[in-house]
Amino acid sequence: MRNVVLLFAAQPEISRMVGAEPIAIKYFPFLVGREISKLSDGMSPSVKLAVPDTAPFQMSRRHFTIEQEGDSIIVRDYGSHNGTIVNGFMLGAGSRAFHAVLSPGENNIIAGTLISKFQFTCLV
């Protein structure tokens, strides 16, 4: 059994949205996306972490997943409009790559473009 993967908000604005404490990811896949509506619970049925965003959107409704694949932990762009940047490597959004293996230790994940506020640190 793999150790728990931890996801941290890497920007103060995101910490205010999701909390300053790390999110312990124990079950996979773990889907991150945009809040959909204030009329419902704001989450798509399979989204585990829903964050608010306003137009022009950086975060897609279903943006990226953190998954376990064999002995590896990977990030997979879920077909987002702006792509996902993992440790400086672009996934989706015109790139031919759609997943990246996370390294042991700290990994940087940006949902959207380089100017996106949706920046996370994932500890594997």
Q: What would you call each of these model-derived segments?
A:
Residues 48, 63-65, 70-106:
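Forkhead-associated
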Residues 1-57, 101-108, 113-124:
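Intrinsically disordered, low-complexity acidic Ser/Thr-rich regulatory segments
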Residues 55-58, 75-77:
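Short histidine-centered beta-strand/loop micro-motifs
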